[in-house]
Amino acid sequence: MRKVLKKAALCTFGFSMLFGCASEEDTIVMAPVPVVQNQFEPTTEWTSSIGDGVGHYFSRLTPVYAYQKIYVASRDGLVKALDPENGKTIWERDLEQDDTARLSGGLTLTYGKVFIGSENGELITLDAETGEELWREKVDGEVLAKPLADEGYVMVHTSRGALIAFDAETGVEQWQINSEVPNLTLRGDSAPVSISGGVFWGMSNGRLAAALISKGQLLWQQPVGTPKGATEIDRLVDVDASPLILGSRLYTVGYNGQLIALDLRTGQPVWKRNYSSAMNMSSDGKRLFLVTEKDHVVAVDARSGTELWSNEELEYRQLTSPMIIDSYIVLADSEGYLHWLDRDTGLFMSQQEIDSDGIAVSPILVEDSFLVVTREGDIKKMRIK
């Protein structure tokens, strides 16, 4: 049975402006759960929890495996380091002060520190070994995207269109690059990435930018999408996906825009294809895997931009970004299912219902296992048999 959802309702609950907000008469139809003959069944190694999770709020708050620990956080401010062997808590820290912490951007683990952003406009830094709070700085706008730490800096991309760099040790602001933000944008921002002293990020105005980390000097900008249409909704062109770097090329995709391959040094386009998405992509080095605005899962040849396969059976199931685990593409959805697709064909290989409350972010790899966190904060470490 297909589930019919109001676009306006989706916007109200914030799952996504990914569908755009329209009149009450506009509806989308969520595809039913596909019938899959499972080729394998993952086993659960242990379970744990992290507060109340992120609830029904928009969130890309993602766990991280680093320093032989699993780091997780909840929207209301609880941060934990877990033992990957048994899920037991090594340390925990409550970041709530006068108001709910509203953690939203992260987690980032670098320099022996945990960097987390919040909807309250804060960048918070903890000691990764002890959980001790080291420093906390205010920024103009929400921090919805994962911070980036490189070259001794930690950088955040805010909802006001600013990329701000702080000294990773002291929290002192070093530089800021600002961009114009349209009146209406999607919920979410592009997490910056870096290589060879350069930082790259997408903007709400439909452009991709590059800057020199050491100076905060803008190097180039490249349009990914051009506003079209009569209404502000039609003219949404946010580039919310985090750029993806493969060799000498950089890949990005925009909402109502294009999937584009760029020369990393010059920013000049190598090829463009008509795909619309606000989700991060993944790659196995030869292929790009993306989820479109309609939740179609697509594989594209990274060299030429040729579409290799497309799976449309999960349409409007509010998928997470695609994750590569072994020879599979793994996606979770808003009804709490994990879907496993064959990397070469896009065909279903397995499916599990993890939690009916839904899953907001992709699973992560933990050595030869993987970790799933539900919207309500339940944590499962699992392994393919």
UniProtKB/Swiss-Prot annotation:
A lipid is attached at C21 (S-diacylglycerol cysteine). Residues 1-20 form the signal peptide. One of its GO terms (biological process) is Gram-negative-bacterium-type cell outer membrane assembly. It is found in: Cell outer membrane. GO terms for cellular component: cell outer membrane. Pfam families: PQQ_2. PROSITE patterns: PROKAR_LIPOPROTEIN. InterPro entries: BamB, PQQ_b-propeller_rpt, PQQ_rpt_dom, Quinoprotein_ADH-like_sf, WD40/YVTN_repeat-like_dom_sf. It is a lipid-anchor. Keywords: Cell outer membrane, Lipoprotein, Membrane, Palmitate, Signal. SUPFAM superfamilies: Quinoprotein alcohol dehydrogenase-like. Part of the outer membrane protein assembly complex, which is involved in assembly and insertion of beta-barrel proteins into the outer membrane. HAMAP family: OM_assembly_BamB. Belongs to the BamB family. Part of the Bam complex. This is Outer membrane protein assembly factor BamB. The lineage of its organism: Bacteria, Pseudomonadati, Pseudomonadota, Gammaproteobacteria, Vibrionales. The gene is bamB.
